[in-house]
């Protein structure tokens, strides 16, 4: 793997604008600010292989062919990732797979009944990338890593050497009201059904959600930039696919694996950050002392301990932090590890 260093770009969104409209471009954005504890940002595009699909039906694309295969995308991903990439402990990524998995695919593994699908995108999509641009905020440098000096890589080099910030105002407009996929009557009916399940002891917590949609015009990348800079979430991401633009603004990392050690940090419990010092302290103390918030957090901790127990060595799962207060740009959270 080749490595070239460039000057430090503090804001990854500045230089991602160079590739944001390229094929399957991806930005993993740590939103460096006084609340962020992340070291790296990473971006890439134009994967050598694309793997996507639903259930046991997959599509594999490269620059020469497109194959439909009767096998789940995760198994295919393992197969194509056998060609290892050179490791560098100083970098978080030296080539490999980047993409997303949906709850819908997870439901298939758990044999949970699926409702009728009205959202025509893959349940899983991963690109295998052989180049990336990485910003290291600790040592304040930008690093281009690549396997081959392709035309795209050379173009990126040239653009970085002569880069000037583009202050283009991206246009984005909302052309309709938000619309839920549930009517008010349907929502109330389902809510009451959930209450009855809990009272009867069939379950003790349900994540009941609804999907909102609207019509829009303009640049999705523009709205991502605006929202990312407003929220400052440490696990933000922008994924540009032909079938969808995916934006993430999350304070929460689901899973981190380092060798044989796996970590999850569930968040349950929230209070707003106040500019008034006294009120802010009150919000933190209120969150610390909330039986309701602690009970919800503990439910998720127990759930994840159980999930880890299915895959980890017996007796190796432990809670190292319970009900810790962490502060982000706009909110205080109750976090366990």
Residue positions per predicted region:
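Extended alpha-helical targeting/anchoring segments
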Residues: 1-337
């Amino acid at each position: 793997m080749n490595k070239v260093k460039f000057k430090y770009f503090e804001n990854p969104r500045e230089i991602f604008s160079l590739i944001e409209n390229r094929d399957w471009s991806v930005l993993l954005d740590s939103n460096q600010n006084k609340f962020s504890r992340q070291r790296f940002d990473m971006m890439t595009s134009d994967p050598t292989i694309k793997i996507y699909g639903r259930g046991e039906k997959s599509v594999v694309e490269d620059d020469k062919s497109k194959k439909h295969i009767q096998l789940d995308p995760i198994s295919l991903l393992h197969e194509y990732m056998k060609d290892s990439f050179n490791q560098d402990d100083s970098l978080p990524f030296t080539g490999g797979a980047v993409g997303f998995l949906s709850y819908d695919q997870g439901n298939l593994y758990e044999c949970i009944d699926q409702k009728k699908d009205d959202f025509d995108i893959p349940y899983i999509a991963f690109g295998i990338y052989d180049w990336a641009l990485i910003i290291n905020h600790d040592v304040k440098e930008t690093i281009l890593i690549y396997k081959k000096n392709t035309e795209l890589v050379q173009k990126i080099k040239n653009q970085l050497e002569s880069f000037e910030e583009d202050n283009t105002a991206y246009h984005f407009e909302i052309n309709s009201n938000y619309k839920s996929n549930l009517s008010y009557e349907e929502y109330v009916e389902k809510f009451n059904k959930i209450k009855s399940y809990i009272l009867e002891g069939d379950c003790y917590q349900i994540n009941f959600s609804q999907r909102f949609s609207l019509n829009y015009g303009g640049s999705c990348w523009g709205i991502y930039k605006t929202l990312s800079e407003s929220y400052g979430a440490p696990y933000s991401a922008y994924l540009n696919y032909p079938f969808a633009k995916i934006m993430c603004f999350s304070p929460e990392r689901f899973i981190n694996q380092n060798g044989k050690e796996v970590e999850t940090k569930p968040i349950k419990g929230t209070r707003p950050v106040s500019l008034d010092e006294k009120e802010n302290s009150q919000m933190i103390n209120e969150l610390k002392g909330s039986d309701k918030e602690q009970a919800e957090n503990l439910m998720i901790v127990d759930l994840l301990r159980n999930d880890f127990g299915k895959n980890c060595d017996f007796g190796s799962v432990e809670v190292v932090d319970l009900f810790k207060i962490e502060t982000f740009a706009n909110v205080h959270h109750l976090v366990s590890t």
